[in-house]
Amino acid sequence: WLRHSGMSELFRVLSHVDCHVIVTTDHGSIRTNRPIKIVGDRNTNTNLRYKLGKNLNYNPREVFVIKTPAEAQLPAPNLSTSYVFASGAAFFAYPNNYNYYVPYYKDTFQHGGISMEEMLIPLVTLTPRRRMGG
């Protein structure tokens, strides 16, 4: 896509200028294909890759759990708030309407989990080559 974008022309122009260009982007996403059942109350957030709330019910072997949000510098709307994160290609699905939502969200790109693709932020510094004789 770079060749056909405005960025390509911008990089070409900047390659003739004595400058440094720093390129970065937001975190990425991951293609999900493995549902994990989770139960929460009606105040539980709707994100498919992480949940926060009170009284979350899940299989602890399938998720990464933070029971004390302050220790991870995360906000806690209530004293009993905990966070549950999906890893790898997993996504959360509620047992009610499970058979409807699993095919709907399977093979979609999601973010908010703890995979490398979602946690790492790409960063590159571009410097023009020095030209001989000028």
What is the meaning of each model-derived region?
Residues W1-G134:
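Feature captures the catalytic ectodomains and active-site-proximal regions of enzymes
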